[in-house]
UniProtKB/Swiss-Prot annotation:
<comment type="pathway">
    <text>Amino-acid biosynthesis; L-arginine biosynthesis; N(2)-acetyl-L-ornithine from L-glutamate: step 1/4.</text>
</comment>
<dbReference type="InterPro" id="IPR002813">
    <property type="entry name" value="Arg_biosynth_ArgJ"/>
</dbReference>
<protein>
    <recommendedName>
        <fullName>Arginine biosynthesis bifunctional protein ArgJ</fullName>
        <ecNumber>2.3.1.35</ecNumber>
        <ecNumber>2.3.1.1</ecNumber>
    </recommendedName>
</protein>
<dbReference type="GO" id="GO:0005737">
    <property type="term" value="C:cytoplasm"/>
</dbReference>
<feature type="binding site">
    <location>
        <position position="195"/>
    </location>
    <ligand>
        <name>substrate</name>
    </ligand>
</feature>
<keyword id="KW-0511">Multifunctional enzyme</keyword>
<feature type="site" description="Involved in the stabilization of negative charge on the oxyanion by the formation of the oxyanion hole">
    <location>
        <position position="122"/>
    </location>
</feature>
<feature type="binding site">
    <location>
        <position position="285"/>
    </location>
    <ligand>
        <name>substrate</name>
    </ligand>
</feature>
<comment type="pathway">
    <text>Amino-acid biosynthesis; L-arginine biosynthesis; L-ornithine and N-acetyl-L-glutamate from L-glutamate and N(2)-acetyl-L-ornithine (cyclic): step 1/1.</text>
</comment>
<keyword id="KW-0068">Autocatalytic cleavage</keyword>
<keyword id="KW-0012">Acyltransferase</keyword>
<feature type="binding site">
    <location>
        <position position="184"/>
    </location>
    <ligand>
        <name>substrate</name>
    </ligand>
</feature>
<dbReference type="InterPro" id="IPR042195">
    <property type="entry name" value="ArgJ_beta_C"/>
</dbReference>
<comment type="subunit">
    <text>Heterotetramer of two alpha and two beta chains.</text>
</comment>
<keyword id="KW-0055">Arginine biosynthesis</keyword>
<feature type="binding site">
    <location>
        <position position="158"/>
    </location>
    <ligand>
        <name>substrate</name>
    </ligand>
</feature>
<dbReference type="GO" id="GO:0004358">
    <property type="term" value="F:glutamate N-acetyltransferase activity"/>
</dbReference>
């Protein structure tokens, strides 16, 4: 957890309502940090539907393997998350730590280990001492309450400077339902399935298969469209749970994601995921500016996204943003190296509303002062027209500052 809050942090935080069917508690287990909570336990009063997306890293953490193994069952009764240790690249010791944690959680809750989901975040390669959970999970299960979202978000922070929370409401068949979510992430963030840790819960009654389809569709334009440093974590986990408590209000269970009754819910879920994803970008390690990169006129949407990511992940583009330098030549460079089709003499580039380049050269009406004024803002919009087709995509990133180097140079100390 950083000592100073990001200047891009929300000015106010969402008031997180209690959500029926789920309770939470946190504790300080001393996994790495001192004088702060580092374990979160989330309990479901009744079996909840569960969906999840995870890192595509070829070196996934032991908790990710555990979640993937349990996900096909479609049911969750408990989630245990720890910060300070990723339990990744820890071999047999890591798998044993995961087994012991799931076993202890299942015993505390009174459920099967197959209904327990785990996540860890922190240093890679350090064995996780699961004995630190001894006695802790029993106490958490006994003390869990419904209105603990903000504290839950704080417990899973690492280099984050503020807790990330969001809430939305919707209607399904005329019955009001709520959606609450938390996330953590500030570094090692790149679009690849989930790109950090996030846990979203609704009191809607939705079957696991429908929930999975909703999550997979919602993640692409949100968490899969943000990047801080182009590095994909070994531990990326995004999970969505449905407690089904709204059935008590007369909400009929939804089995199919294509059911039109889910239209409002889908929109609310997508909006919440976008909110959390942008909070992650705004808390990028050392970030002082957020960057919105939009590419249009590419061969197709996939090509547009790859070009946008080439721009967003370019250290030269990101340092130019940090220095408030309207260096559109670096954007040209990033387009050219993307591997996608681009015609140099058709390119047009805008910083905000200021067109800085057109038809392969600097705009004849280019104003350094006007472009610099855009770069001095807190949010920097960069738009590129490739001039070839109708493909379009938007991704979000942040600047690259000296503080990023300092934070990551000192991370293990």
């Amino acid at each position: 957890m950083s000592g100073s809050v990001s200047p891009l942090a929300p000015k106010t935080f969402a008031e997180m309502p209690a959500l029926r069917g789920v309770r939470m508690a946190t504790a300080a287990a001393g996994i790495k940090y001192k004088n702060r909570t580092d374990v979160l336990m989330m309990l479901f009063d009744r079996p909840a539907s569960v969906a999840g997306v995870f890192t595509r890293s070829k070196c996934p953490s032991a908790p990710v393997d555990h979640c993937r193994q349990n996900l096909p069952g479609g049911i969750a009764r408990a989630v245990v998350v720890n910060s300070g240790n990723a339990n990744a690249f820890t071999g047999k010791k890591g798998r044993e730590a995961t087994r012991l944690t799931a076993e202890a959680a299942a015993k505390a809750v009174g459920c099967s280990e197959a209904e327990v989901f785990l996540a860890s975040t922190g240093v890679i390669g350090e064995p996780l001492d699961a004995t630190k959970f001894a006695g802790v999970l029993d106490k958490l299960a006994a003390s869990a309450t419904q209105d603990f979202w903000f504290e839950a978000a704080k417990a899973i922070m690492t280099t984050d400077t503020y807790p990330k929370v969001a809430t939305r409401s919707a209607e399904i068949g005329g019955v009001k339902v709520a959606i609450n979510g938390i996330a953590k992430g500030a570094g090692m963030i790149a679009p690849d399935m989930a790109t950090m840790l996030s846990f979203v819960v609704t009191d809607a009654d939705i079957a696991p298969a429908a929930l999975q389809a909703l999550l997979q569709a919602g993640v692409e334009p949100t968490f899969n469209s943000v990047t801080v440093d182009s590095d994909t974590s070994t531990s990326d986990t995004l999970m969505l749970f449905a407690t089904g408590a709204a059935a008590g209000d007369g909400q009929a269970k939804v089995e199919d994601a294509a059911d039109p009754r889910l239209d409002g819910f889908r929109a609310a879920l997508d909006d919440l995921l976008r909110d959390l994803a942008l909070q992650v970008v705004r808390d990028g390690e050392g970030a002082r500016k957020m960057v919105e990169v939009t590419v249009e006129g590419a061969e197709n949407d996939a090509a547009a996204k790859r070009i946008a990511l080439s721009i967003a992940n370019s250290p030269l583009v990101k340092t130019a943003v940090a220095g408030e330098d309207a260096n559109w030549g670096r954007v040209v460079m990033a387009v050219g190296k993307s591997g996608e089709m681009a015609e140099r003499d058709r390119l047009a580039i805008w910083f905000g509303d200021i067109r800085v380049a057109v038809e392969g050269e600097r705009d004849p009406a280019y104003s350094e002062a006007a472009a610099t004024a855009v770069m001095q803002g807190e949010t920097i919009p960069i738009r590129v027209d490739i001039g070839l087709g109708s493909g379009r995509a938007t991704v979000y990133t942040c600047d690259l500052t000296k503080e990023y180097v300092e934070i990551n140079g000192d991370y293990r100390s």
